[in-house]
Amino acid sequence: LLLFINLLCFVFVSKGQNLVLNPSFEDTIACSVFQNNNYPQMPCTGWYWASGGSCDYFSEQYLCISSPAPYNGWGWQYPKTGVAYCGFALFTNFSPQFNNYREYLGGQLIDTLKQGHTYCVSFYVVNADSGKYYTSNIGMYLSPDSSVDYSTALNLPYTPQIVNTNGIIYDTLNWTQISGNYVAGGGG
């Protein structure tokens, strides 16, 4: 009873520039650093858990993890580009302890967004083979700070500015692009 969506990258485009730090998740930290201090940091530079739920990292080359790509423990999936991707559970309901459990992935930008400027934002998702739920309700929340809450693995109170308009995403083979325009407000 696990919905598992694999996330490829957040792409912020302003005049063709990608403002995401490590958008394909391929720059990694040393195995010893990750294995000794992995909460809430992901093994890929610039990415982190944005809640108490633990996102997953899959790579064809990073051997510090037990679930390399393309077989990832939840099914089988090649990365959209490169050799790595991240995955997270949007909803699980498999026991009373994990009722409404959610995972959120956070990422860093290489520069501050300029107030009043419009940015094209896109990312790609695909369902895990083992997923038993599907969703149309997936999006991205942009914030001038890290917007994390490690005290909970439940639904966070943020309204995403970029939302899926493709309907329910059933595909377990092909990556689906989710995109939209974002006008940066004050503070970033």
PLM features: residue spans?
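Bacterial Sec-dependent N-terminal signal peptides
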Residues: L1-V20
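Aromatic (Trp/Tyr/Phe) and Gly/Pro-enriched flexible surface segments
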Residues: Q17-T118, S122-A128, Y133-S143, Y150-G188
